[in-house]
Amino acid sequence: MDETAQDDGASTDDVVQQDVVQQVVDGTAWREFCALLADAGESILAAGNPEDPLDRAEGFRMLTRLMRGSLESFLEHAQPRHPQLICTCHETIKIVGENPDNHYLGASLDGKYDYRIWGTRGEAKWISFNLFSGAGFGGGGPGTGATLHEEHMHIEPDGSFEVIISQTEHPGNWLRSEADTRSIAIRQTFLDKRGQEHADLHIERIGDQGATPPDPLTPEALHQALTIVGHYTKIVAGIGAQWAVRQAQWPNVFTDEAEDDLTDKFKDPQIKWHQAYFDLGEDEALVVEVVPPACDYWMIALHNHWMETLDYVNHQSTLNCHSATLEPDGSARFVVAHRDPGVANWLDTAGHRHGTVGVRWVGPDVVDVLPSTRVVALSELA
């Protein structure tokens, strides 16, 4: 009886595998992938989203960026037996509300394996390691699992260190993985990302150390990757758009009313993040005032309607605790405007009449605060 049940199970698995292979061979998998991408485009056209040409163009560009980044993560580098640390969030591949001061690294993992990360720390102001379950941000799963921050790590005087990832406890720097652990995210946060040295990090699966080469691509792996990437692109695009639409109900005001549980569960626990939706006329400015709390690092940045940071390479659309000018009493005043008002801490909207402005307070035990805002005529600031 048991043998028959096992044979039936094996037979069913074989049929499913053969069906998956056939879907790749006859092009069904590719056509379904293209259909998912077409469906993702409906997120851009959904009610509540702006219809002007700039927003629409950036919305559809966002889909291509999400697709590019997720193909790197879920297809090109999705071998947990041979993990690689890759950066798939940067100046031209963005995700909901990413931090311009961060250098993001990630790798595909499998909770049944143990891993070692090693290297040198570099000059980042703040660094964190987060394990994710499921497909990671936007792809489902419980969200952030174990986390590790520098104050709980041993780092040698020369900046070198190692971190072990395993289900069983390990002495030293250790991240507890679970059976459903599927990826890691490493954030390096810089005061001056271009001018400071980045960490030199490496990862290996313990017990392999490069002894066996990666497996060739299989139809099953391609089918799975295309399915995940298609859904990921649609889901993450929807997260950004829906969040902004909700936030726009409270224009030019910081509020947590629009917070999304799906994004909240993928946060690092030491990061406090708040948003406002700016909507300004040509001759208006949004004044943002706050006394930044005591923390390791803080920043402010502008985003478009789709929650992508604006072009911070060619525009001053972000400032941090190192680059901003503070008042004598320790407070900070930022001015969001379409053109330079000739005052300190101008944040350039880079041609965007509306979008979001976000602040981050980062570190352990941060006393959270919300900035105050007011809309003024640009002439009042001259």
Whereabouts are the PLM-identified features?
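A compositional/structural signature for long, glycine/proline-rich flexible linkers
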Residues: 2-382
